[in-house]
Design a protein with these regions (language model features):
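Acidic, glycine-rich loop-and-beta core segments that form the ion-binding/anion-interacting portion
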Residues: 217-305
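Alpha-helical coiled-coil oligomerization motifs
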Residues: 141, 145-148, 189-192, 259, ...
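Glycine-rich cofactor/substrate-binding loops
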Residues: 2-38, 99-100, 267, 282-446
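A general structural motif at alpha-helix termini
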Residues: 60-61, 217, 273-275, 362, ...
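A helix-coil-helix interface module used to build multimeric assemblies
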Residues: 1-203, 208-214, 221, 277-278, ...
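Generic, well-ordered alpha-helical scaffold segments in large soluble proteins
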Residues: 42, 63, 67-70, 92, ...
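Alpha-helix capping and helix-loop boundary segments enriched in small/acidic/polar residues
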Residues: 105, 110-113, 157-164, 168, ...
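Short amphipathic alpha-helical segments with heptad-repeat character
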Residues: 119, 123-130, 134, 141, ...
Length: 446
């Protein structure tokens, strides 16, 4: 078994080793690229303060770029007996460069390394989420504009209520995604601050230049207080998880609507046959499994903030191994949410709308408010008009006028999709992805 970075003259018990390492070797593969990027920035800073010579820096950077290329191609592995990605990278450097590889850890702890890795990983995955949310948003706005004239029943308490439209339905979920990205942007601001240099949570006696690594990695700012930088472990993940839960909540609700509207009892929308699954016993079945799985996966993601909260709950300041378990629920959640966004976008692009829903007389009563409003406009007090129409309904004499005349902002006749699109564009511009991408590219390419 390879010696741990921290082992001295006593080898750790095998069962203790297996238990404490847990799933780190598997999950740290997600962090490999970012661990290398962090090391590039750190050693560049070490050279600037005299802890590495220029020729040593050049040799280390060249080797780290080779390791980065392996990770980028998915060929990086964490060997048996190696605890984590940090240990594996240092081991690879030491094998290739001897004692020079042992110098990269000066002024650094695995505590601030993993903080940094998680932040670099998370901000890149946030960028992917933003792109996928924008893709779904574009489809929803397009469908809203395409079907803006097609009416469907609106419901309260699952009872037929008032006229709605597919323009409103698609557009509502588009605007919901705008607010979801606003929350994600707030989480991104917390994520995009540099913890490197906080070491084990109490700083270092080396004259580290933390602003330099902040600039090299394209962070917006620092986690200044070194104790708080360590306290941010769990807090950052929980904040991002709340934002992910917001997106998941939108997807879950949309998936429920789609399942319900696709059922034979509603028949508002239809999925292409190739987008449905069948039954082993009922030959007529065409099941909306994609939406059902999206609903379940999204509901699972909505529980993510609570999972992280319970792992961190009642921990004092400082580092504790409890925090390791956050990775097990946090890292895979990005894959699940991204999969849901891709599939819902794919489904919503191809959904077929029933343009003759209101030919069915069962929906006649949803025009009752329209009739009340017409009488109010003719001069009858609202409460009297309400009573007149109510009595006509009870007597079976109500005859609906199925023409609707809604003109105010955000209504059937004035969807404000251009304004909603403008809001989405403004939110996306508020992310500092350009600086992040440029900084990482510069480190990789030299």
């Amino acid at each position: 078994m390879a010696q741990k970075l921290w082992e001295k003259n006593v080898q750790v018990d095998h069962e203790v080793d297996e238990f404490t390492v847990g799933k780190d070797r598997e999950l740290d593969l997600y962090l490999a690229k970012y661990d290398v990027l962090g090391s590039m920035a750190h050693i560049t800073m070490l050279e600037s303060i005299g802890l590495l010579a220029k020729d040593e820096l050049d040799v280390l950077l060249k080797e780290l770029r080779s390791i980065y290329a392996l990770a980028d191609k998915g060929e990086f592995i964490i060997e048996e007996g190696i605890e984590d990605v940090h240990s594996q990278v240092e081991l690879m450097l030491t094998r290739q460069l001897g004692d020079l590889g042992k110098k990269i850890h000066s002024g650094r702890s695995r505590n601030d390394q993993v903080l940094l890795d998680l932040k670099l990983f998370t901000r890149n995955r946030i960028q992917s989420l933003v792109e996928l949310v924008k893709g779904l948003f574009d489809v929803l706005i397009s469908q809203s504009n395409r079907y803006k004239e097609v009416l469907l029943p609106g419901y309260t308490h699952l009872q037929i209520a008032m006229p709605s439209s597919f323009g409103l339905w698609f557009g509502a979920y588009a605007e919901s995604l705008v607010d979801d990205l606003r929350l994600l942007q707030a989480a991104y601001k917390i994520c995009n601050r540099n913890p490197l240099g906080s070491a084990a949570g109490y700083g270092s006696s080396f004259p580290l230049n933390r602003q330099m690594t902040t600039d090299l990695l394209g962070f917006d700012s620092l986690d200044y207080n070194v104790v708080y930088a360590q306290m941010g472990r769990g807090k950052m993940e929980r904040t991002v998880a709340f934002a992910m839960a917001g997106i998941a909540g939108t997807l879950s609700k949309l998936a429920f609507d789609a399942c319900m509207f696709n059922s034979q009892n509603f028949g508002f929308i239809k999925l292409p046959d190739q987008f449905t699954t069948g039954s082993s016993i009922m030959p007529h079945k065409k099941n909306p499994d994609v939406f059902e799985l999206t609903r379940a996966k999204s509901n699972k993601i909505q529980g993510l903030p609570q999972q992280i909260t319970l792992i961190c709950n009642n921990l004092p300041s400082g580092y504790f191994r409890d925090l390791q378990l956050i990775k097990e629920v946090f890292i895979p959640a990005f894959d699940e949410l991204e999969d849901c966004l891709r599939m819902v976008t794919h489904m919503m692009r191809e959904v077929k709308v029933n343009e003759h829903i209101l030919d069915d007389d069962r929906y006649a009563l949803m025009f009752s408010v329209e009739e009340v409003n017409r009488r109010v406009l003719a001069g009858i007090p609202f409460r009297d008009a309400y009573k007149q129409v109510g009595l006509e309904i009870e007597a079976g004499k109500f005859i609906p006028d199925k023409n609707v005349h809604h003109t105010h902002e955000g209504s059937i006749g004035n969807l404000c999709n251009d304004q909603i699109t403008s809001m989405m564009q403004d939110v996306i511009k508020s992310f500092s992805f350009g600086r992040m991408n440029e900084a990482e590219k510069k480190l990789i390419q030299g």
